[in-house]
Amino acid sequence: MKNIRNFSIIAHIDHGKSTLSDRLIQSCGGLSDREMEAQVLDSMDLERERGITIKAQSVTLNYRAKDGETYQLNFIDTPGHVDFSYEVSRSLAACEGALLVVDAGQGVEAQTLANCYTAIEMDLEVVPILNKIDLPAAEPERVAEEIEDIVGIDAIDAVRCSAKTGVGIEDVLEEIVRKIPAPEGDPNAPLQALIIDSWFDNYLGVVSLVRVKNGILRKGDKIKVMSTGQSYNVDRLGIFTPKQVDTTELKTGEVGWLVCAIKDILGAPVGDTLTSHHNPATSVLPGFKKVKPQVYAGLFPISSDDYESFRDALGKLSLNDASLFYEPENSTALGFGFRCGFLGLLHMEIIQERLEREYDLDLITTAPTVVYEVEQTNGEVIYVDSPAKLPPLNNIAEIREPIAECNMLLPQSYLGNVITLCVEKRGVQTNMVYHGNQVALTYEIPMGEVVLDFFDRLKSTSRGYASLDYGFKRFQAADMVRVDIMINGERVDALALIVHKDNAQYRGRELVEKMRELIPRQQFDIAIQAAIGNHIIARSTVKQLRKNVLAKCYGGDVSRKKKLLQKQKEGKKRMKSLGNVEVPQEAFLAILHVGKDK
């Protein structure tokens, strides 16, 4: 057991985590050179296309160190985006140490900080590593100072390596063996194993990734899931050397996967503890805090026949992604679907894309909203995650919107632009610290403004140099109103949005204009209106198409022309009272882009 090392790799987006893991696998002979490909651990097609890590992946390697001993390294590659920070905290719960990878050209960024603090809070040994030293722009000395200055860990003798060229990889491995402590645990105690992750395999049922904290997990054992109290037999277990390899037992301190024919998707929740059926442990391992979704959106299948398969797909996906929340919802415009909660817009995009790809569904998404705390006049407090659920205006005493605390790191030269952006987003500055050439800014910005397009605009105002980390802070009273969109006098529930009163007029007008371009012309006029309660704030009209009924009259009598026009008018009138308007998918997505192209 003293030769086991469990660690995660944490870093900001694009600082080279996945490439470093490739090199570690290669130098320990986990895969032959023929099987080696770039970013071997990013196994999802989506991850490869976007070049980002979404799911944490684990690998077990054997490394023969310079002191002649062979060490077993279990490591977990983690994502860097703020939307997937939950994956990171789960991975860290299974480790004793973390490699903090910092790009020697870019230096410390917001995510580096956030992930590093998470690791330090969990009492992990943090080992700094300077990556990409082969770049001409690399300044390892400056970055090492920056790590000490901003993060506050010792970094003068940080290992310098280049994952791309393979320089210094040996030193990284030696550093891991030397600095990261061996796992603690009692092999003779009752079994306790933490479920780090699980996913659904169509042949095997639920496959779980576990970390054995105490005791030994053997093939054929009868185990019990502590939260549900159900027992299962262990059919297969093993490790990833990125390939799945079967073994007969997992010892204390090891990380591996197991299959025990759980057919029910909720059978082995992530963060749960497994123990032995005959000799159960008394206490549950401390798991991870459940994350609350920050952004909600409605997802509806385009054809209602897909509803069943959509429900199953969501179930399977939520097993693999514990931060996804969903509940059934129905809309008059879109039929039956689900209200889903996500950690951020990127997360929402990824989930939608995974549903469409892996489960072959066609979906419509409604505009994302955040959760509002609403105090009603009778003193009851409710949480509203969709504009349709907002009670009528005269029943509302106060609406409180969620405020996010945003930590930004950026070069001084972009400070002005970023402050302007934050003010425009109704932000309040709470802190500003200079670290050499970098500035650490802290703002409190309404969550609704952050999730909409804050990240994209922060990146574009700072030419990609600013980095952001945000988290929910509190609810705060604000003057929010619901803007309804009416098409021919009928409210379309899927198009409603909750906005701040100051922006309502502007957002309403913009949305109405946008809808006008997207709704196809019909044989009659279509009025598109934006309303707050009964008060109309904006209107535009999609002009009717009309046939020239006078084309066949040559000169002729005016009463003849009047008769034809009158007849056409009556026809249009009848049509208008009966006709209903098809709203195309693009129109629902228009809401997403309102307020973006300023």
From Swiss-Prot:
<dbReference type="GO" id="GO:0003746">
    <property type="term" value="F:translation elongation factor activity"/>
</dbReference>
<feature type="domain" description="tr-type G">
    <location>
        <begin position="2"/>
        <end position="184"/>
    </location>
</feature>
<keyword id="KW-0378">Hydrolase</keyword>
<dbReference type="InterPro" id="IPR031157">
    <property type="entry name" value="G_TR_CS"/>
</dbReference>
<dbReference type="GO" id="GO:0005525">
    <property type="term" value="F:GTP binding"/>
</dbReference>
<feature type="binding site">
    <location>
        <begin position="14"/>
        <end position="19"/>
    </location>
    <ligand>
        <name>GTP</name>
    </ligand>
</feature>
<protein>
    <recommendedName>
        <fullName>Elongation factor 4</fullName>
        <ecNumber>3.6.5.n1</ecNumber>
    </recommendedName>
</protein>
<keyword id="KW-0648">Protein biosynthesis</keyword>
<keyword id="KW-0342">GTP-binding</keyword>
<dbReference type="GO" id="GO:0003924">
    <property type="term" value="F:GTPase activity"/>
</dbReference>
<dbReference type="InterPro" id="IPR038363">
    <property type="entry name" value="LepA_C_sf"/>
</dbReference>
<keyword id="KW-0997">Cell inner membrane</keyword>
<dbReference type="InterPro" id="IPR000795">
    <property type="entry name" value="T_Tr_GTP-bd_dom"/>
</dbReference>
<dbReference type="GO" id="GO:0045727">
    <property type="term" value="P:positive regulation of translation"/>
</dbReference>
<comment type="similarity">
    <text>Belongs to the TRAFAC class translation factor GTPase superfamily. Classic translation factor GTPase family. LepA subfamily.</text>
</comment>
<dbReference type="InterPro" id="IPR006297">
    <property type="entry name" value="EF-4"/>
</dbReference>
<dbReference type="InterPro" id="IPR005225">
    <property type="entry name" value="Small_GTP-bd"/>
</dbReference>
<dbReference type="InterPro" id="IPR027417">
    <property type="entry name" value="P-loop_NTPase"/>
</dbReference>
<dbReference type="InterPro" id="IPR035647">
    <property type="entry name" value="EFG_III/V"/>
</dbReference>
<dbReference type="InterPro" id="IPR013842">
    <property type="entry name" value="LepA_CTD"/>
</dbReference>
<dbReference type="Pfam" id="PF00009">
    <property type="entry name" value="GTP_EFTU"/>
</dbReference>
<dbReference type="Pfam" id="PF06421">
    <property type="entry name" value="LepA_C"/>
</dbReference>
<feature type="binding site">
    <location>
        <begin position="131"/>
        <end position="134"/>
    </location>
    <ligand>
        <name>GTP</name>
    </ligand>
</feature>
<comment type="function">
    <text>Required for accurate and efficient protein synthesis under certain stress conditions. May act as a fidelity factor of the translation reaction, by catalyzing a one-codon backward translocation of tRNAs on improperly translocated ribosomes. Back-translocation proceeds from a post-translocation (POST) complex to a pre-translocation (PRE) complex, thus giving elongation factor G a second chance to translocate the tRNAs correctly. Binds to ribosomes in a GTP-dependent manner.</text>
</comment>
<dbReference type="InterPro" id="IPR004161">
    <property type="entry name" value="EFTu-like_2"/>
</dbReference>
<dbReference type="GO" id="GO:0005886">
    <property type="term" value="C:plasma membrane"/>
</dbReference>
<dbReference type="Pfam" id="PF03144">
    <property type="entry name" value="GTP_EFTU_D2"/>
</dbReference>
<keyword id="KW-0547">Nucleotide-binding</keyword>
<dbReference type="InterPro" id="IPR035654">
    <property type="entry name" value="LepA_IV"/>
</dbReference>
<dbReference type="Pfam" id="PF00679">
    <property type="entry name" value="EFG_C"/>
</dbReference>
<dbReference type="GO" id="GO:0097216">
    <property type="term" value="F:guanosine tetraphosphate binding"/>
</dbReference>
<keyword id="KW-1003">Cell membrane</keyword>
<keyword id="KW-0472">Membrane</keyword>
<dbReference type="GO" id="GO:0043022">
    <property type="term" value="F:ribosome binding"/>
</dbReference>
<dbReference type="InterPro" id="IPR000640">
    <property type="entry name" value="EFG_V-like"/>
</dbReference>
